[in-house]
């Protein structure tokens, strides 16, 4: 069995039942590596002598040190949480317009989303290179902060985009460069899924994005997402208020919430051990002398595959309805976030890693990570091949103040420069080497098609365990509503 198949065998995802379901899929992928040989292709492209590419990388370094490093620091010192990133968007789009991009803001009804397009003077009859930019901050006990280094991701993209457009214009290479400004990576609903549903990514031939990390690591090919498949669900119980001394005149929504929360705990023993179900009661009533008539229970439901995840979600819906029935209250269910597996393409992962080694990226990890579908962009990566580039930019874990501080230090600045150069190198090769475009398209098309077969196989294998839920709907049940935000 080839290395690619062995890699897929241990990572599609991690449970015995998934490996059983994946068996037939793995056999079909076996011939894919023989045709493409992604590691060999990547090493050949990265190792070749190419003065034009090297000039592009030198230009990335000049743009980063001259403009983008200070922009990264500025965004870092002015953190804005998801859906509120107005200063960052104003600044980034002004720079892109100065670089010759045509910029649309408020895309797909999101005030802080934008798309910036540049077309080569040689024409648009070439590849469309997409770069995903993020800029939202985290909420923290000490105030909003860039503990995931999103402040650097957009300047990284802009440095790569600037160097590529200059090369394409000077060398008369046809094609387009598109920068997608995507807000709110850290909060629900998932903005990239909403942008995908609105058709914003339509027309892109490749997408690249970067993300901070404590190591430089490529992912294994296959199907997956960084943090398991997730349903973010709110259960709202509505009752009737009354004085607590005559509580029988009311309908206690808090009692319903507690009964539901307790029922979920009892259900855990009936679920596979890979399930991760975490919840809070953010709204539990106002005063102890009033029967609560409104409560909210907020859950993240996680599982390695979406088939069993939906089974868990349906059981929880039934438990919520039961709690409402017991207490004489009503319950409404809102799925405000949905994260699903994407497709990870070895041709791009290996190319990114080959350039990481060539450029001296710190913290190289030989062991590959699990398939991530360039993180929370799962549905996007099923349609458009892409790669998430991670270069070690901190010695502290993600979502920490230590990682925020490293954003402004040499460890961060150096990593961000290498990240920008890798993005530019991967896109340069995709632009100038039809062999790479063919390999990426073939691999992505095959994996995207096999993902459907894999999910159907999971339904068959799970059948006796989840019963009628084997015939799950392919349509999203999520209510992904854009929050209403006013510009300050």
Model regions and ranges:
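Acidic/His- and Gly-rich active-site-bordering loop/insert found
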Residues: 16-147, 151-176
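Metal-dependent amide/peptide-bond hydrolase catalytic core
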Residues: 49, 255-258, 262-488
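Short Gly/Pro-enriched turn/cap motifs at secondary-structure boundaries
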Residues: 105-106, 184-185, 223-227, 368-371, ...
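Non-cysteine beta-strand/loop elements that form the S-adenosyl-L-methionine
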Residues: 130-132, 233-235, 388-394
């Amino acid at each position: 069995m080839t290395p690619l198949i062995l890699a897929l065998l241990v990572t599609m995802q991690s449970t015995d039942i998934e490996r059983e379901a994946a068996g037939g899929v793995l056999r079909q992928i076996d011939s894919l590596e023989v045709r493409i040989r992604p590691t060999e292709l990547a090493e050949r492209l990265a190792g070749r002598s190419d003065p034009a590419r090297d000039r592009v990388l030198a230009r990335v370094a000049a743009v980063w040190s001259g403009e983008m490093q200070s922009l990264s620091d500025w965004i870092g010192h002015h953190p804005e949480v998801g859906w509120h990133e107005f200063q960052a968007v104003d600044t980034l789009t002004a720079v892109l317009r100065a670089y010759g991009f045509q910029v649309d803001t408020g895309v797909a009804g999101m005030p802080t989303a934008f798309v910036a397009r540049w077309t080569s003077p040689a024409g648009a009859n070439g590849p469309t290179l997409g770069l995903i930019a993020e800029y939202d901050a985290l909420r923290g006990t000490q105030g909003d902060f860039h503990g995931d280094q999103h402040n650097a991701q957009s300047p990284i993209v802009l440095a790569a985009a600037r160097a590529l457009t200059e090369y394409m214009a000077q060398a008369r290479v046809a094609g387009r460069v598109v920068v997608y400004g995507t807000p709110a990576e850290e909060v629900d609903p998932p903005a990239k899924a909403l942008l995908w549903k609105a058709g914003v990514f339509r027309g892109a031939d490749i997408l690249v994005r970067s993300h901070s990390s404590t190591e430089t690591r490529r992912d294994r090919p296959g199907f997956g997402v960084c943090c398991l498949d997730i349903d973010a669900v709110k259960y709202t119980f509505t009752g009737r208020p009354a004085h607590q001394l005559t509580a029988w005149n009311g309908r206690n929504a808090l009692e319903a919430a507690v009964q539901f929360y307790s029922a979920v705990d009892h259900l855990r023993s009936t679920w596979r051990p890979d399930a991760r179900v975490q919840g809070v009661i953010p709204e539990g009533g106002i005063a102890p002398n009033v029967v609560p008539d409104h409560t909210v229970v907020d859950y993240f439901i996680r599982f390695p595959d979406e088939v069993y995840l939906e089974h868990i979600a349906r059981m929880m819906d039934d438990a919520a309805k039961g709690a409402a029935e017991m207490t004489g209250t009503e319950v409404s269910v809102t799925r405000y976030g949905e994260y699903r597996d994407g497709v990870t393409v070895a041709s791009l992962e290996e190319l990114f890693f080959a350039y990481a080694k060539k450029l001296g990226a710190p913290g190289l990890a030989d062991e590959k990570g699990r398939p991530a579908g360039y993180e929370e962009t799962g549905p996007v990566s099923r349609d458009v091949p892409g790669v998430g580039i991670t270069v070690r930019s901190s010695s502290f874990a993600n979502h920490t103040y230590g990682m925020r501080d490293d954003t402004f230090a040499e460890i961060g600045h150096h990593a961000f420069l290498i990240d920008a150069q890798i993005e530019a190198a991967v896109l340069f090769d995709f632009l100038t080497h039809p062999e790479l475009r063919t390999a990426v398209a073939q691999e992505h098309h095959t994996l995207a098609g096999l993902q459907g077969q894999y999910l159907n196989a999971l339904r068959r294998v799970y059948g006796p365990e989840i019963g009628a839920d084997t015939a799950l709907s392919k349509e999203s049940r999520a209510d992904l509503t854009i929050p209403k935000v006013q510009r300050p």
